[in-house]
């Protein structure tokens, strides 16, 4: 063997594998509520990490799985600091962790009191930075028989862009609370 070649014994053992899933806590720098990079990755601390400080140095960036992802389109929900997440490992490789879900727990309860509201489903966000439990956006579906409802709450503004036609059918009353101002920039025809 030439003197300038470093001797390395052959690898006898295969790379370790992590099968199954683990839970972890989303972490970031002090004072932040959301911490991510341009790819939507986050940092976590595993419960077995006794030396971690639950900050932005607790792990490397970890990718977050989503049901739908493409070039400049898809779904995005960045787990926030303090959320409990599920971590899997691609092909069992401990160097390739991926966030595959989030969990409710005693510190982060579901948005609708259960089991009383078990017929409700939806999306409820939390205003950031420093929003309270009263600051949120929400789309909620009530599926209880004879009380079915789709509820939309915008904490501030609701903007709707319709590129073509809008058709609505209101079976009974069409109520608008508060003052209203209507601006028409071109023509309007009422029948």
Question: What does each model-found stretch correspond to?
Answer:
Residues 1-18:
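OB/S1-fold single-stranded nucleic-acid-binding modules
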Residues 3, 18-191:
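Structural signature for extended repeat/solenoid scaffolds and their inter-repeat hinge/linker regions
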């Amino acid at each position: 063997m030439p003197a300038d070649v470093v001797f390395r014994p052959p690898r006898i053992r295969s790379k370790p594998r992590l099968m199954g899933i683990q839970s972890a806590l989303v972490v970031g720098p002090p004072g932040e509520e959301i911490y991510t990079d341009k790819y939507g990755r986050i940092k976590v601390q595993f419960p077995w990490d006794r030396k971690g400080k639950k900050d932005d140095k607790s792990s490397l960036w970890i990718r977050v799985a989503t049901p739908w992802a493409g070039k400049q389109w898809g779904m995005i929900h960045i787990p926030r600091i303090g959320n409990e997440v599920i971590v899997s490992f691609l092909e069992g490789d401990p160097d390739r962790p991926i966030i595959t879900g989030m969990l409710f727990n005693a510190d982060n309860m579901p948005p609708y009191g259960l089991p009383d509201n078990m017929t409700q489903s939806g999306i409820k966000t939390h205003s950031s930075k420093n929003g309270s439990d009263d600051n949120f956006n929400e789309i909620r579906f009530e599926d209880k028989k004879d009380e079915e409802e789709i509820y939309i709450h915008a904490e501030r503004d609701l903007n709707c862009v319709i590129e073509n036609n809008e058709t609505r059918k209101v079976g009974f009353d069409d109520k608008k609370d508060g003052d209203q101002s209507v601006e028409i920039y071109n023509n309007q025809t009422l029948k």
